[in-house]
Amino acid sequence: MRILDRSIYVGPSHYARFPVIRLELDLGELEAWPTGKLGRGFVNALIEALPGLAEHGCSYQEPGGFIRRMNEDDGTWLGHVLEHVALELQNVAGEDVTFGKTRSLD
């Protein structure tokens, strides 16, 4: 995985009306490895490292929703996982951040 570009928007932008951090990534070989393929061990280790992820609602809009997304069917993509890790690291640092979006740039 490589970070291709990063930008910080301190005010309203075409991404949001509030400050955001934008990363453009190349997942490389990891693009073919959703969480379902990585297995529950990956998910469990991630939650152990960042327990606050257990509170992320994700698209289910309820605590545990993100964990549910990682475990259901084929799971979710690692770009989406990185989105939640970035949000949680900001929360651990004392910022009340909840907004994130992941998009594929095929």
Where does each model-flagged region fall?
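Charge-rich, well-structured scaffold segments of protease-associated domains
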Residues: 1-26, 88-106
